Amino acid sequence: MTPPRKLHIKSYGCQMNVYDAQRMVDTLAPEGFVETASAEDADLVILNTCHIREKASEKVYSELGRLRVAKDEAARGGRAMQIAVAGCVAQAEGEEIVRRAPVVDVVVGPQSYHHLPELLKRAGNEGRAVETEFPAADKFGFLAQPKPDAIRARGISAFVTVQEGCDKFCTFCVVPYTRGAEVSRPVARIVDDVKRLADNGVRELTLIGQNVNAYHGDGPDGKSWPLGRLLEHLAGIPGIARLRYSTSHPRDVDDSLIAAHRDLAALMPFVHLPVQSGSDRILAAMNRKHTADDYRRVIDRFRAARQDIAFSSDFIVGFPGESEQDFLATLALVTQIGYAAAYSFKYSARPGTPAADMQETVSPAEMDQRLERLQELIDSQQSAFNKAAIGSTVDVLFERPARKDGQIVGRTAFLQPAHVMASPGIIGQILPVRIDSLERYSFLGELVTPRVAREPALSPIATGA
């Protein structure tokens, strides 16, 4: 029997890359590859890359420098190691990667992962293989499906890609160039994936896409289904207790999505809705095609539909031309909305984007100062949101043993980690927990009732409407 070959994948960036990494593992399993935690011991190392920020892509080249040493060590020991660069850096830079890092054997863009087996063979025969085209075929129809044991090993939460690409062309963003135009998967294929996951123990699904609420997939009735209708359908699949989605664009929030948050108890009341800036002038320069007040109105619609809903967001400071007044408008928006969590970044010019050619730049020192001020406000809001839960009882979906002996960790509806002393038998169950204290970002608490599974109702949530 041929011994299995070892595969190590390191993913950078977004949730889509986590999903893509799992699908690459599934695609390579029939070729005899099994995952290993060590890059040094691997026969194949894949760097699944992100191109959103300059530091992310530079990390890849730093990692390739370390892998060159590991590859040389393997060769001295008589073992061949292949190195592949996948993801958005691969798509954006293509042949430049092998010129800059000759240690790389394969460069493969996000739309071509189903070609990995043949690309590895080609690299073995020809020395290099680069594929970064946008093929017309839907890659999702060709990627291997995970086996039941692989699904169970990955735990009770899973990502499912329903949409890929973006048509918005924000001036700072490379996604339309690296992931292509918006494409939605057919409803039937998504349902098949979800049923397979549910049959093998998955309780929580996060539907993902670069612009997930732009989803309009072909439904079984011959009509185009929006995200809200898809969520409603998936909520009825036995075994699925929680639904989430990410990442959203304010312009694509429609009535069906608002209704889903009003009506579906399985749909968690936590929405990641990036806005990037609170200044209309900067939003226009970013080509966001909405104003700060447009964003506020979207938030109001969600809150009218479900009172306990909470939000996270993304913000960029130091976008070209951002004045102190523009930045103060961002602080005002954050103060007014009140976030459970948010992510702030200094502007990073990406080659090939319109913003990279904008001349009126903000100094690094000013960016640092604004980032610190914004993050201080965000941190204070997150701390207040978390502390408000102390003393209350919340439902927690338990996921795995914690690092501390005897503890099991799960997550609340708002993705806050919660630790309790309990047996592993509660993993996969949703149970009420009294929150006793907060340590940094994690709760400590106690189970309130006997350890019996509680399923969230799929009936409409009572509202004042």
Swiss-Prot record:
Keyword Plastid (UniProt): no
Top-rank EC class of the record's enzyme: transferase
Primary localization class, coarse: cytoplasm
One Pfam match: UPF0004
UniProt KW DNA-binding keyword: no
Cofactor: [4Fe-4S] cluster
Membership in a protein family: Belongs to the methylthiotransferase family. MiaB subfamily.
Described purpose of this protein according to its UniProt entry: Catalyzes the methylthiolation of N6-(dimethylallyl)adenosine (i(6)A), leading to the formation of 2-methylthio-N6-(dimethylallyl)adenosine (ms(2)i(6)A) at position 37 in tRNAs that read codons beginning with uridine.
Stated name of the protein: tRNA-2-methylthio-N(6)-dimethylallyladenosine synthase
Organism: Bradyrhizobium diazoefficiens (strain JCM 10833 / BCRC 13528 / IAM 13628 / NBRC 14792 / USDA 110)
Organism ancestry: Bacteria, Pseudomonadati, Pseudomonadota, Alphaproteobacteria, Hyphomicrobiales
